[in-house]
């Protein structure tokens, strides 16, 4: 398997778990919050009119994630947006296991430092159940994407799903994994 190098999972097991057990007073190792999945989504509005745009972004997302991206379809028709039910409206990929850990490692160490005018992630973007969402404005910050290949700059949403029950537990987990949050 090509995904054997997983430095973030080792860091989680050796450094993060003991710190979280001590800070939050967990008695069982299975109570400690962990990452479940990372969902990367690109909403491509122009894709409903131009199939080539959707396919190009699907290829880019596949390259970024290392896993085949799926094209999402509209669930219902919205006349104001000129969208009918079943039209292609975006691209997404769900990462779990070693691919997820490698993506998060790459995101924290390579991608976020390359973002222009980056001051840290917003610590208020948790959903109340321990999941964290944020957006990137362009796909050029990923090392796999070269500016010559892309036709159109497109942003993306990234959702990090954890088993944490509360936002403070999830935030501490992500801080220990290296996510750079803004100081409040």
Swiss-Prot record:
Entry keyword set: Ribonucleoprotein, Ribosomal protein, RNA-binding, rRNA-binding, tRNA-binding
A single GO cellular-component term on record: ribosome
Top-level division of the source organism's lineage: Bacteria
Gene Ontology MF term list: rRNA binding; structural constituent of ribosome; tRNA binding
Keyword Ribosomal protein: yes
GO BP: any one term: translation
Record-linked Gene3D superfamilies: 3.30.1440.10
Keyword Cell division: no
PROSITE patterns: RIBOSOMAL_L5
Pfam families in alphabetical order: Ribosomal_L5, Ribosomal_L5_C
SUPFAM superfamilies xref list: RL5-like (SSF55282)
Function, in words: This is one of the proteins that bind and probably mediate the attachment of the 5S RNA into the large ribosomal subunit, where it forms part of the central protuberance. In the 70S ribosome it contacts protein S13 of the 30S subunit (bridge B1b), connecting the 2 subunits; this bridge is implicated in subunit movement. Contacts the P site tRNA; the 5S rRNA and some of its associated proteins might help stabilize positioning of ribosome-bound tRNAs.
PANTHER family (UniProt xref): 60S RIBOSOMAL PROTEIN L11-RELATED
Homology family: Belongs to the universal ribosomal protein uL5 family.
Oligomeric form and interacting partners: Part of the 50S ribosomal subunit; part of the 5S rRNA/L5/L18/L25 subcomplex. Contacts the 5S rRNA and the P site tRNA. Forms a bridge to the 30S subunit in the 70S ribosome.
Record's protein name: Large ribosomal subunit protein uL5
Source organism per UniProt: Fervidobacterium nodosum (strain ATCC 35602 / DSM 5306 / Rt17-B1)
Gene: rplE
């Amino acid at each position: 398997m090509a995904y054997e190098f997983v430095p973030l999972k080792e860091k989680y097991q050796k450094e993060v778990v003991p710190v979280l057990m001590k800070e939050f007073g967990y008695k069982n190792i299975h109570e400690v919050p962990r990452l479940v999945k990372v969902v990367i989504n690109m909403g491509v509005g122009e894709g409903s009119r131009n199939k080539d745009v959707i396919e190009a972004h699907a290829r880019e997302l596949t390259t970024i994630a290392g896993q085949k991206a799926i094209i999402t379809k509209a669930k219902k028709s919205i006349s104001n947006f000129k969208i009918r039910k079943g039209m292609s409206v975006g691209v997404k990929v769900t990462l779990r296991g070693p691919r997820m850990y490698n993506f998060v490692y790459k995101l924290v160490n390579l991608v976020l430092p390359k973002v222009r005018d980056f001051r840290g992630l917003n610590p208020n973007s948790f959903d109340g159940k321990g999941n964290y969402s944020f957006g990137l404005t362009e796909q050029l910050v990923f090392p796999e994407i070269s500016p010559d290949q892309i036709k159109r700059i497109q942003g993306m949403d990234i959702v990090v799903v954890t088993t944490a029950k509360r936002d403070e537990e999830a935030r501490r987990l992500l801080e220990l994994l290296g996510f750079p949050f803004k100081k409040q």
